[in-house]
């Protein structure tokens, strides 16, 4: 229940969007908190801002915007900590070797967290690389390796086999379609015979 109230405290109770750098938590004179976007919309339709809960009036001097209202320091400290700890994963497909780059969790000073490899190759040639140090390390089947020799061979073999299989599959499909066309052509030439081409 406490996490539910904490979660609702981190979102604007008007639009139900989470507070962020774009939607800053602004304190009204009555100490209720709303996001800056909702307050700006309220300010467009009214000269004064009335709290949606207690109807208390918050005056903003002419020429000033909602951004001049004080931020809610409690909520602001929570969202700044949570936003700095989060990272958005970015997946990049590398067509040369079929690897995908995934983000690596880093410490505040930019070093990898203890016990976390800077790069590893997982199933289906998925790789995670830390590009900050300029080196590529690969986690093989037996642990963290220094180079990429063995894994490069595996990736090259996988890519080669994928190409060979694709060529064989396309050739098989073309031969199958050619057989259908030749069969239909032979049936057309025997149009008036007693034997059916079924």
Curated annotation (Swiss-Prot):
Keyword field: Lysosome, Membrane, Metal-binding, Transferase, Transmembrane, Transmembrane helix, Ubl conjugation pathway, Zinc, Zinc-finger
Mode of membrane association: Single-pass membrane protein
Alphabetical list of CDD domains matching this protein: RING-HC_RNF152
Keyword Nucleotidyltransferase: no
Family annotation (InterPro entries): RING_RNF152, RNF152_C, Znf_C3HC4_RING-type, Znf_RING, Znf_RING/FYVE/PHD
Compartments in which it is found: Lysosome membrane
Transmembrane segment boundaries: 162-182
Reaction(s) this enzyme catalyzes, per UniProt: S-ubiquitinyl-[E2 ubiquitin-conjugating enzyme]-L-cysteine + [acceptor protein]-L-lysine = [E2 ubiquitin-conjugating enzyme]-L-cysteine + N(6)-ubiquitinyl-[acceptor protein]-L-lysine
UniProt xrefs under Pfam families: RNF152_C, zf-C3HC4
EC number(s) recorded for this UniProt protein: 2.3.2.27
Organism superkingdom: Eukaryota
EC top class named in words: transferase
Subcellular location, principal: membrane
Pathway named in the protein's UniProt entry: Protein modification; protein ubiquitination
RING-type zinc finger segments: 12-55
PROSITE patterns: ZF_RING_2 (PS50089)
GO terms for biological process, alphabetical: apoptotic process; cellular response to amino acid starvation; eye development; hindbrain development; midbrain-hindbrain boundary development; negative regulation of TORC1 signaling; positive regulation of autophagy; protein K48-linked ubiquitination
Family recorded in the similarity comment: Belongs to the RNF152 family.
Function field: E3 ubiquitin-protein ligase that acts as a negative regulator of mTORC1 signaling by mediating ubiquitination of RagA/RRAGA and RHEB. Catalyzes 'Lys-63'-linked polyubiquitination of RagA/RRAGA in response to amino acid starvation, thereby regulating mTORC1 signaling. Also mediates monoubiquitination of RHEB, promoting its association with the TSC-TBC complex and subsequent inhibition. Also mediates 'Lys-48'-linked polyubiquitination of target proteins and their subsequent targeting to the proteasome for degradation.
Name of this chain's protein: E3 ubiquitin-protein ligase rnf152
């Amino acid at each position: 229940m406490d996490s539910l109230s904490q979660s609702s405290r981190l979102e604007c109770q008007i639009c139900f969007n989470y507070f962020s750098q774009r939607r800053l938590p602004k304190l009204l004179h009555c100490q209720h908190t709303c996001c800056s976007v909702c307050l700006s919309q309220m300010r467009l339709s009214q000269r004064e801002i009335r709290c949606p809960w207690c109807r208390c009036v918050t005056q903003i001097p002419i020429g000033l915007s909602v951004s001049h209202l004080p931020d809610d320091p409690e909520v602001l400290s929570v969202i700044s900590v949570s936003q700095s700890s989060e990272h958005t994963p970015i997946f990049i497909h590398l067509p040369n070797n079929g690897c995908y780059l995934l983000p690596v969790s880093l410490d505040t000073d930019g070093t990898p967290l203890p016990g976390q490899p800077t790069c590893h190759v997982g199933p289906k040639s998925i790789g995670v690389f830390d590009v900050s140090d300029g080196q590529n390390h690969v986690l093989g089947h037996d642990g963290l390796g220094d180079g990429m020799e063995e894994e490069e061979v595996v990736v090259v073999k996988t890519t080669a086999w994928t190409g060979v299989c694709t060529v064989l599959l396309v050739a098989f499909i073309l031969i199958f379609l050619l057989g259908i066309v030749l069969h239909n052509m032979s049936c057309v030439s025997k149009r008036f015979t007693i034997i059916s081409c079924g």
